[in-house]
Structure formats: C-alpha cells, structure tokens
A protein has these predicted regions:
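A short, structured beta-strand/loop element
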Residues: 2-41
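Long, charge-rich, low-complexity alpha-helical segments
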Residues: 25-70
Length: 70
C-alpha cells in the first residue's frame, strides 16, 4: 500500500497531526491502543473509519522503518 494512502498530514486537520488518510483519527491512537494491550480489533471497532488494511499497512511500514534504522 502506498504510504500516502495510509497516513496524511494536513494543517487544516487536527493542526497537522498525522492521521489515517481519509479520517480524523490520529495514527498515534493506534499505537496508544496497542501499547495499552488492546488488540487491533478493539481499535478498529472504536474507529470504524480506519480500515484494517490501513492499520496493518501502518504497522508494517513502522516496523520496516525501525528495522531499517537498526
């Protein structure tokens, strides 16, 4: 999935906070849920505007960047 289709940054949306593209859901919120021990399905139920494909692609991209920097 194209990274531009996963997360977008627009100064008019939440002051430029990175959000899942096409939503007003901050990408950080997914990480907060996972850090709290909540499964991906709980996040997706709470934020139905974020698709499973977007969430998984975000996590894959984040992992790829972390591993590339290691």
């Amino acid at each position: 999935m194209n990274p531009r289709l996963i997360v977008s940054v627009d100064p008019e949306i939440l002051g430029g906070t990175p959000v899942f593209a096409g939503t007003r859901v901050p990408a950080r919120t997914l990480l907060d849920y996972l850090e709290a021990g909540d499964p991906l399905d709980v996040f997706l139920e709470d934020f139905p505007t974020v698709s499973r494909q977007q969430a998984v692609a975000f996590l894959e991209e984040a992992a790829e960047r972390v591993l590339a920097a290691a």
